[in-house]
Amino acid sequence: VLMGMLVECGFWAVILVGIARLQDRFWPLAAGAAEGFLSRFVAFCGAGLYEEVLFRLLLMPALAWGLARLGATPAAAAVWAVFGSSLLFSIAHYVGPLGDAFDPYSFTFRFLAGGFFAVLFAIRGFGIAAGSHAAYDMLVGLV
């Protein structure tokens, strides 16, 4: 089971890299800061796990529940939960002292990536979403 999950996470990460490359045709991608390999590896694993817990495992169901209580149909609540959690996921990358300077390219890509991970979470579950997020971060940050 774990080997299958690992392969699937790698597959989804490669798909998201392809989306990033496609978007890169329209906007140049800023280069990241140089750090040690091990510290970047740990940071990428941690970011994938932490962000998926916060934005998909906790926020998405909370948004869907709240919207359903306000009268939204289950389908509409799910769609708006994906949209809202993706928007907040993107915004969160620009907040605080370690936040990035706002850039339309990275904002758009992070919003799309948030939607990508949200759909993965809804269809395949937390493990695949978190693993794919960590694998994507490692692919673009270490390779």
What spans do the regions from the language model cover?
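Transmembrane helix-loop-helix hairpins at the membrane interface
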Residues: 37-143
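Juxtamembrane helix-loop-helix connectors linking adjacent transmembrane helices
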Residues: 1-48, 64-72
